[in-house]
Amino acid sequence: MSNDHPQPLDAAEIPRFAGIPTFMRLPAFTDPAALQVGLIGVPWDGGTTNRAGARHGPREVRNLSSLMRKVHHVSRIAPYDLVRVGDLGDAPVNPIDLLDSLRRIEGFYRQVHAAGTLPLSVGGDHLVTLPIFRALGRERPLGMVHFDAHSDTNDRYFGDNPYTHGTPFRRAIEEGLLDPLRTVQIGIRGSVYSPDDDAFARECGIRVIHMEEFVELGVEATLAEARRVVGAGPTYVSFDVDVLDPAFAPGTGTPEIGGMTSLQAQQLVRGLRGLDLVGADVVEVSPPFDVGGATALVGATMMFELLCLLAESAARSA
């Protein structure tokens, strides 16, 4: 163990329900340059078109992340021994101004990126990923592994509104931040607005693995396809909790039945080990619609799964 690496509070010494909540019970930091991986909340759901409440996601995920321990039980990755990890607090948001929130979030992540820190974020609705991409993808477009029930490549909602949680990846592709040929979406399902709903994703070259295809392929073949698509370049992972069946993640804005199990999601994320990861997020945890903290626990657990991968990625580039 490196003695100068921040460590979580020990639950054998300080009970999980005690102390000030931070992600993974790690120390809080204000300077991203002090860290190699920064844990960040984005408490904003101004792009939500159905059930609001994801603005409360970061706080509840912080609470439930107290259940995470120090070492991954399968991979044996000990992220806090590999790199310096800490809680960078929440990105600034404006709850009554969508465009100002996008600017504020982008500015925050530009500082994180300039410091060379890999961000691991908790939303917030899925629109928060767009300003993160604006900060991380300016130098070169990123590849992406995207877990979701929805493609989030729609164009406009409610007239001519280009910014909702259903549009972030269309905007990111249009702005040259996301490479569609290095993008794979896993778990897509549910009814659609029109037969052409997936036309943009299909025509620009995104590899879409609908839930039905995932069931046929299984975890290993799906992972092989995902790794083929993103290749060796810089890659971002975006995990929307509604990729899970509502039985496992009821507290979300736009639930869809017929989703994957929490174990399948864990296996898929673990299978991304070794990719050139530059950041990740967990979004759409909506505590007002949660049951017994189940979805917040999903968010915290998937955050730890992603942290283990990002820690290895940061250690390789150190």
UniProtKB/Swiss-Prot annotation:
This protein's record includes keyword Nucleus: no
Annotated keywords: Hydrolase, Manganese, Metal-binding
UniProt cofactor note: Binds 2 manganese ions per subunit.
CDD domains with a match to the protein in the record: Agmatinase_PAH (cd11592)
Manganese recorded as keyword: yes
Any single Pfam family the record assigns to this protein: Arginase
Binding positions (Mn(2+) 1): H126, D148, D152
PANTHER family, sorted: ARGINASE/AGMATINASE (PTHR11358), GUANIDINO ACID HYDROLASE, MITOCHONDRIAL (PTHR11358:SF26)
Purpose of the protein: Catalyzes the hydrolysis of 3-guanidinopropanoate to beta-alanine and urea. Possesses low activity against 4-guanidinobutanoate. Has no activity against arginine and agmatine.
Protein name: Guanidinopropionase
